[in-house]
Amino acid sequence: MTRLTLALDAMGGDFGPCVTVPAALQALASNPALNLLLVGDPAAITPLLAKVDSDLLSRLEVVPAESVIASDARPSQAIRASRGTSMRIALELIKDGRAQACVSAGNTGALMGLAKLLIKPLEGIERPALVSVLPHQQHGKTVVLDLGANVDCDSTMLVQFAVMGSVMAEEVLELKNPRVALLNIGEEESKGLSTIREAAAQLKEAPSINYIGYLEGNDLLTGKTDVMVCDGFVGNVTLKTVEGVVRMFLSLLKSPASGPGQKQKRSWWLKWLGRLLQKRLSKRFGHLNPDQYNGACLLGLRGTVIKSHGAANQRAFAVAIEQAMQTVRRQLPDRIAARLEAVLPKSD
């Protein structure tokens, strides 16, 4: 199996090395062909490696970084002061050819800006988009973008997102002629912002895109479309709302609510029935757990950059690492570039 080397921004996210280092070790243990470059403060990282097996340590290198970009820093300021930060160094490792992908749970705006500066967008792409693959109720998956990289999007950007999402659905989900929809406040053609209506008009005329029209937020997990396109503001709010609802639902399955108005004593058969239902429902809906699809790819770059949730736990960050590996092995940037050349106009 071909060896892979990934760079991890070990200091990014809400929990920094406390999550990223154990997740890195988990990924190394599961993937013998994986090497990792942990970028960050050695004083914070090294103690977490004290009891690690020598085989894992042989495939791990700590790359020192002087500082970290704060999660609440303004992207423009963060980029100007980014030299020496763990995020920038991790991206530079891709640029210099030492790593094939980067994973960070840090500041989204800064990651977007630095990735565009250092890795460069593909020909014909104005701005990369954050994209993730979400499960739906038909036991399939839906490509959703943009999830927060671009708050303001014009119609041209939405069309580019549609093309990239369609290519990803074909290459990653192996779908033929994937359905593409625009997320809107209604399915009527007159609904929505002018940018959405203009994008719809362009997509209708694009022979390479199987555009099916507008869909609403409640259609996201129904399987009505293979690709859902929206601007980054709407996408981020939608994603986090869905994740919040799913987490609440799964927590209720594990521990049914009880309160002053509810009887605490139940017969043995009711307790048995409750546990049985919890187990079956948890198994039935467990695939919706947001931790299992953490990690959004910055689609449209010449390299692979994965953005993890800032609040990701060890399991979720390990999933983001796995996604980076899959993206590299599928050569997604190269395959998308080849398709984009045929369907998008080249930039000046």
Curated annotation (Swiss-Prot):
Entry GO CC: cytoplasm
Molecular functions per Gene Ontology: phosphate:acyl-[acyl carrier protein] acyltransferase activity
Protein name in the entry: Phosphate acyltransferase
Function: Catalyzes the reversible formation of acyl-phosphate (acyl-PO(4)) from acyl-[acyl-carrier-protein] (acyl-ACP). This enzyme utilizes acyl-ACP as fatty acyl donor, but not acyl-CoA.
This protein's pathway: Lipid metabolism; phospholipid metabolism
Organism placement in taxonomy: Bacteria, Pseudomonadati, Pseudomonadota, Gammaproteobacteria, Enterobacterales
Localization per record: Cytoplasm
Listed EC numbers: 2.3.1.274
Family: Belongs to the PlsX family.
PANTHER family cross-referenced by the UniProt entry: FATTY ACID/PHOSPHOLIPID SYNTHESIS PROTEIN PLSX, PHOSPHATE ACYLTRANSFERASE
Reaction(s) catalysed by this chain's protein: a fatty acyl-[ACP] + phosphate = an acyl phosphate + holo-[ACP]
Protein origin, superkingdom: Bacteria
Oligomer status and interactors: Homodimer. Probably interacts with PlsY.
One BP term from GO: phospholipid biosynthetic process
Keywords, comma-separated and alphabetical: Cytoplasm, Lipid biosynthesis, Lipid metabolism, Phospholipid biosynthesis, Phospholipid metabolism, Transferase
